[in-house]
Amino acid sequence: MGAGCVKVTKYFLFLFNLLFFILGAVILGFGVWILADKNSFISVLQTSSSSLQVGAYVFIGVGAITIVMGFLGCIGAVNEVRCLLGLYFVFLLLILIAQVTVGVLFYFNADKLKKEMGNTVMDIIRNYTANATSSREEAWDYVQAQVKCCGWVSHYNWTENEELMGFTKTTYPCSCEKIKEEDNQLIVKKGFCEADNSTVSENNPEDWPVNTEGCMEKAQAWLQENFGILLGVCAGVAVIELLGLFLSICLCRYIHSEDYSKVPKY
């Protein structure tokens, strides 16, 4: 390998690892966000889903390893330290294997995860109270108001709430209330609201002034719309990682051959 080519490879690998260092910080931050977030669907799930909490710690661990790996790769590439390049190669290979494993597990457990999410949401709906003081209830109110959905499958899921259905007048979950399209301001209401000019003597969900579409459909629609982007990002990261493996091997072999060329021959 020519000296010029080696120099280009070395500094390209340095730039690559600098980006990887930043990526590691982003992944670590994402894991911390999952644990700390209190106002989204993530918060609803993590309060009762051990799988999501484990996933958050995995993100934190992978992020930390990626940061260390990026640092080792930068030092190893600039100073041509073969040992550090070797460690970098091993770390990168392990991360690539882990990503493929997680992807396969997620694909084959998608139905199980969907069922777990549904059970979690329905548990919140059944036990929801007019005061809505728990973190799970507040988080679910935020989700319904932000996404403009109601219930998991539909607004009829709320008929399983005994307190709500015990009202004699038209009463509905406040966070499900249908807002005018021109009103872009997000207002998260809590508890149960009584419909204006309610004259009926029973609480019929047909009369609720709410969004009728369930949050499950909204989530599926979002995934379908952004599936191409998600797939492209994952494929791009995998290609970059494979390129990093290739460059580290090339530089490692060059350093190895250079070391042997300096040995005196008799």
Swiss-Prot record:
Residues listed as glycosylation sites in the UniProt record: N127, N131, N157, N197
Pfam families the UniProt entry points to: Tetraspanin (PF00335)
Residues spanning the signal sequence: none
Keyword Glycoprotein: yes
Extracellular topological domain: 33-53, 111-227
Tissue: Highest expression in the spleen and the kidney. Low expression in skeletal muscle and in the heart.
Record keyword Flavoprotein present: no
Lipidation (S-palmitoyl cysteine): C5, C74
Top-rank lineage group of the source organism: Eukaryota
InterPro entries reported in the protein's UniProt record: Tetraspanin/Peripherin, Tetraspanin_animals, Tetraspanin_CS, Tetraspanin_EC2_sf
Record family assignment: Belongs to the tetraspanin (TM4SF) family.
Subunit structure: Forms homooligomers. Interacts directly with IGSF8. Interacts with EGFR. Interacts with VEGFA and PDGFA. Interacts with ITGA4. Interacts with ITGA6; this interaction reduces ITGA6 cell surface expression. Interacts with ITGB1. Interacts with TLR4; this interaction inhibits TLR4-mediated signaling pathway. Interacts with TLR9. Interacts with PLAUR.
Protein name: CD82 antigen
Lineage start: Eukaryota, Metazoa, Chordata, Craniata, Vertebrata
